[in-house]
């Protein structure tokens, strides 16, 4: 049975394992995410999300296969992006650091997690959804496009300590059209 729930302290080691598996896959050349082992994401990334009560995990049969951070925090580079929809900060929900264990790819866990994020946004009264990803991350960009997210701009930045990142910003409006 698949369930998405708030993360707990006992999930941190498993989330770190997923980060490490992604770093290993990137180093082997089987995926291109644009992350750097030891820089981002790290155990501290998951711990900070947990401490802020913003870490969510997807578990199937008791094993965590996906995780992400959901909050209202818009990174500074978002100010330079031409968002189609304007919303007050408290009406914008952002998904950060969505990860799926590479060994569980193809099971729909990424889609399920994004759908959960959308349901949470509706429950919180947030009509504007924003996500960012490295321009190198073609798999995430395909997933988000498939789920109805629109790429609104790309901004060069230092992303969590990684220089030279081209950050693709995406949005989806859940409110009524204006």
Question: Where do the protein language model's features map onto the residues?
Answer:
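Conserved acyl-donor/pantetheine-binding loop and adjacent beta-alpha core of acyl/acetyltransferases
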Residues: 69-97, 102-105, 158-163
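Conserved GNAT acetyl-CoA-binding A-motif
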Residues: 114, 121-132
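A short beta-loop-alpha structural element at the N-terminal edge
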Residues: 3-17
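C-terminal "cap" of GNAT-fold acetyltransferases
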Residues: 87-89, 127, 134-138, 145-147, ...
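Conserved GNAT-fold acetyl-CoA-binding loop/helix
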Residues: 16, 23-45
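Conserved acetyl-CoA-binding loop-helix of GNAT-fold acetyltransferases
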Residues: 100, 106-119, 142, 146
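Conserved beta-hairpin
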Residues: 54-68
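Hydrophobic adenine-recognition pocket in adenosine-nucleotide-binding enzymes
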Residues: 7, 98-100, 133
